Regions:
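N-terminal intrinsically disordered, cationic/polar leader segments
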Residues: 31, 37-56
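Alpha-helix boundary/capping detector
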Residues: 41-44, 55, 77, 84, ...
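Generic detector of well-ordered alpha-helical packing
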Residues: 8, 60, 73-74
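Residue-level signature of catalytic and energy-coupling elements of molecular machines
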Residues: 15, 51, 75
Length: 106
């Protein structure tokens, strides 16, 4: 409608630009690494910004044949922390892109 300032072509251009920026940000995230550790550094986990676990290091001191549950808990804690870090990284990279269209709720 004339006079309301709504330009569908401009909206489509912005959407395409945002899609390109999103793809670039996701590509960057795939190449960025976060690291987390648990158990005082006995277990260290690395993950990409997209949440793919790329490495788990376990200090031999963490391996107690009489208490495998302790190692399981420490590995789980380190993995969860690495995934949280990856999510935070992704949010910081991608979070501002949705607002680019100026639409409420995005």
């Amino acid at each position: 409608m004339p006079g309301q300032g709504f330009d569908m072509n401009e909206l489509m251009r912005q959407a395409q630009q945002m899609q390109t920026q999103m793809a670039q940000a996701q590509e960057q995230l795939a190449h960025e690494t976060v690291e987390a550790s648990a158990g005082g550094g006995l277990v260290t986990v690395k993950a990409t910004g997209t949440g793919e676990i790329t490495e788990i290091k376990i200090d031999p001191k963490a391996i107690d044949p009489d208490d495998p549950e302790m190692l399981e808990d420490v590995v789980l804690a380190a993995v969860n922390e690495a995934l949280r870090s990856a999510q935070n990284l992704a949010q910081s990279k991608l979070g501002g892109l949705a607002g680019g269209l100026g639409l409420p709720g995005l």
